[in-house]
Amino acid sequence: MASIIDFCVCLRRPSKEGFDIVIGNPPYIDSETMTNVMSKLREQYSQIFTCAKGNWDMFVVFVEMGINLCWSGGIYSFILPNKLIAAKYTSKLREKIVINDIIEIRDYSRLPVFINAAVYPCTIVGHKTLSKNCNNSSRFIVMRTVKEIERENSTLQEIIGSEYWDVFFRSEIEFSIIKKFLAHKTILSDKWNVIGSATVAEAYELKKVLYDAKNGSSSLKVINTGTIDPYKSLWGIKSMQYIKGKYQYPRVSQSDLMTISKRRYNQAMSNKIIVAGMSSRIEAVYDDGETLGGKSTTIIMGDDLRFLLGLLNSKLVSFSINILYNSIKMAGGYLNIGTREIENIPIPIASPIVQHSIESLVDGILEKIYENTQMDSSNLENEIDGLVYSLYGLSEDEIKIVESN
């Protein structure tokens, strides 16, 4: 990085105060590697670069430097991990990019561009300017091969913010669905309390006192991502993997949990929704104070939880989340669903009649599951989906797209 700065100084371009074009392929060094191998350098960069926030990777500061090296009117182009498009730690970088003009972003994530690197790449071409023209359009391109385009969308820059770039790569009808989904300005965290279930330290403390027992007085069941299905806890049905341990009936005593964290104890003893953390769709289950959400789950507390449970487990919400965060999916299409993804779900205004209808249907599902965990509740879930489609204002053609996914 220092040699690049020295090179810029040596060229001495006072008339333009920068380069006409900056092109680069930054090193793909992730935050964990930097912390372990170059912690002092990472700390220095965090103080120098405004975009180096959160668990940032090395490419973030390279792009910021590249934009800074351009004169006002210069062009920059980079090949990058597609984490640029939606990762939380690239939000500051996206803010910097949208201040200027985005000429195009190409998504190569489905192609083996780098044979020996586990990276899903994209390319970006941008124009540094002090007078952004919001009437200009940006191109968002999905590549079929390295040379062949599968789909190209043109989007006015005035509607491009610093979040949700994934949607600009989608088809016109998918874009319309997401536009309706995001049109509701109340988000989930405005009405409910969203909490990460455990810190790393708490997770390891829990491991020390976790035990296996089908029955246990003054204790709590424990579930995690692998033992949660939509509406259904798989406790006692499916074994739980937890930090190199395996439990069929995982429990923790109330006193042990109180010792680890009084706050976690109070959360566990409360009515709540527990959401799985790693899944291809949202999987949320209701709990009335009998269960502790283990490592990697998210907890939601507040009123009207049965109404919210119906929304979260609906096809439309999972469809939308999968599009909005497509570029940060892992192998197999799995998405790390945490507090950020949950908090920002738009919540439509429901009339008392519609809300009561959803709550009644959710009650019906929960009653069926209580009687028999294997009982089919798809007819009730489909009725909830129909009400959710209406709340978000989807057309029949848009509903078909969601249902087909």
What are these regions (language model features)?
Residues 2-212, 286-297, 305, 333-342:
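Signature of N6-adenine DNA methyltransferases within the class I
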Residues 10, 22-25, 29, 44, ...:
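Generic, well-ordered alpha-helical scaffold segments in large soluble proteins
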Residues 60, 67-70, 173-354:
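Polybasic, glycine- and aromatic-enriched phosphate-binding surface used to engage nucleic acids
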Residues 131-133, 230-234, 395-398:
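Short helix-capping/linker segments at secondary-structure and domain boundaries
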